[in-house]
Amino acid sequence: KPGERNRLDLSICDQAALPGRPAQAMWRLMTSHPAFSRRLSVAPMMDWTDRHCRAFHRVLTRKTLLYSEMATSPAVVRGDAAHLIGFDPAEQPVALQLGGSDPVELAEAARIGADFGYAEINLNVGCPSDRVQSGRIGACLMREPELVGDCVAAMMAAVDIPVTVKCRIGVDDQDPEDSLFGFVDTVSAAGTQTFIIHARKAWLQGLSPKQNRDVPPLDYPLVRRLKAARPDLEIILNGGLESLDHGLVEGSGVDGIMLGRAAYHTPWTLADADRRVFGATNPVSSRHDAVEAYRPYLAARLSDRVALHSMTRHMLGLFHGCPGARQWRRILSEKANRPGAGLEVLDEALAALSVHAIEAA
């Protein structure tokens, strides 16, 4: 159930204690995932869609596909994978996004991700930041579709779960009509059938990552034309979708939509997704119900010495547009950071909401 503690002890994934990664295989067996749909997903967002964010979003929607933050293949292969990509089984379905350009290393990272129980492995070919470009990661790879195809083929050979690609419609001075179709044709020939497309070009020089999310114009019709011309491919629309309503309108003619900042800043937009998108029953009926459903998760993680702010920061926009929302944000922002902060901070923030609701009545 949403919010219930349902967690495998990550200590079993200790690489040093268990050579050959049998623990990951055990983890995979214990985190099996049912069939899932990409009709709606929440985008991978660095510093935002961590495991605590995903646990909160899962309280609001059982069906929406959730994504990890991007993890680079070197970090997964040579670092502390349990710390980096471990997750709570209650978050499923969850996809792992990888960044990299070495087919052999990406294949190994994909295998590790699959052993952890992820439902999908996604390759990042859309991030425009200078930092990832220097590692030959992200949107710069749109200029190397053959290499991306090699990466995808290697990853698909290593795992038996779907491997997908998230990309832009082009970079710099490329003609999006040519670059997108050519890129998709080359990469799909390597085996992947699913492309999540941020409907903007990426400018690799001269724009910051933030500007690259806003400045280049959106071209939703191009993505719809791609789907019409390549009906056998699964095409997911991403970029600038401001709400579920907006996404459902612009996503007509493609296979699914991916919400990014809208889902994070106003998470209640996910609360009607199961009914509207998947024809299922919504798991919570009010924002207060969502808080209470998340409370057991908060309590469990607090007992693991996780800082309250690490979790409640993802809830700041829950009451957006409601009386008392400012007080809710202020209390959580100011007091959840304090040493030893516990659930009493959450209760204080809820009490402030109640006072403002009464005053507004």
Regions found by a protein language model. Give the residues of each.
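Active-site beta->alpha loop and helix N-cap motifs at the rims of alpha/beta catalytic domains
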Residues: 93-164, 172-176
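Conserved, mostly hydrophobic/aromatic
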Residues: 42, 57, 69, 96, ...
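Glycine-rich, positively charged N-terminal anion/phosphate-binding segment
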Residues: 27-34, 45-119
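Glycine-rich tight-turn/loop motif centered on a GG-T
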Residues: 130-147, 176-178, 206-218, 277-281
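Active-site-proximal loop/turn and secondary-structure-junction residues that shape catalytic pockets
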Residues: 72, 100, 127-129, 169-173, ...
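Alpha/beta catalytic cores of nucleotide-metabolism and tRNA/nucleoside-modifying enzymes
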Residues: 27-32, 36, 40-46, 150-153, ...
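Non-cysteine beta-strand/loop elements that form the S-adenosyl-L-methionine
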Residues: 68, 120-129, 190-201, 258-262
